[in-house]
Swiss-Prot record:
Protein name (database record): 3-isopropylmalate dehydratase small subunit
Positions in coiled-coil regions: none
Gene: leuD
Function: Catalyzes the isomerization between 2-isopropylmalate and 3-isopropylmalate, via the formation of 2-isopropylmaleate.
Assembly information from the UniProt record: Heterodimer of LeuC and LeuD.
Keywords: Amino-acid biosynthesis, Branched-chain amino acid biosynthesis, Leucine biosynthesis, Lyase
Amino acid sequence: MEAFTTHTGRAVPLRRSNVDTDQIIPAHWLKKVTRDGFEDGLFEAWRKDENFVLNRPERQGASVLVAGPDFGTGSSREHAVWALQNYGFKAVISSRFADIFRGNSLKNGLLTVVLEQSVVDALWELSEADPTAEVTVDLEARQVRAEGITADFELDENARWRLLNGLDDISLTLQNEADIAAYEAARPAFKPRTIAA
């Protein structure tokens, strides 16, 4: 997982509330378990509308999604996180996320930032008025900054530490690989063992 410290990029204003994971990536995309190749499935139904915000040329290459409240509701699927990342989003800002989606995001390296709805509104207005306006998401300072906007956000210390250090569940476990190997070597032969790949 790539470490996240500070990211600056253009924003996509997604003025929709209650966006569920099936809208983020439809179920027929869930046939594989690799983490890549999902960008075309992101908001697939909505992207059929030529006026959808992601179809606009000025939004190409934007890397911060500013979403409406209750983003990521519905079923738990890491594919929704992977689709957002594959498209190029490094952070998603909303006034409220579904807990399971937020947990999946943080464990996969996608920073989800909770801000007051008034700040989300200000970011929408800024990015709609000027599609080239940049938004900085600073995890070290726990702050979002844009032209005329500075907002602090909270994130639990464990999730913050893992993101700052680029540690997912597997890499966190592998930090103790030598201890695990020593434990396995000392176990009696009649007990189950881990087999090297």
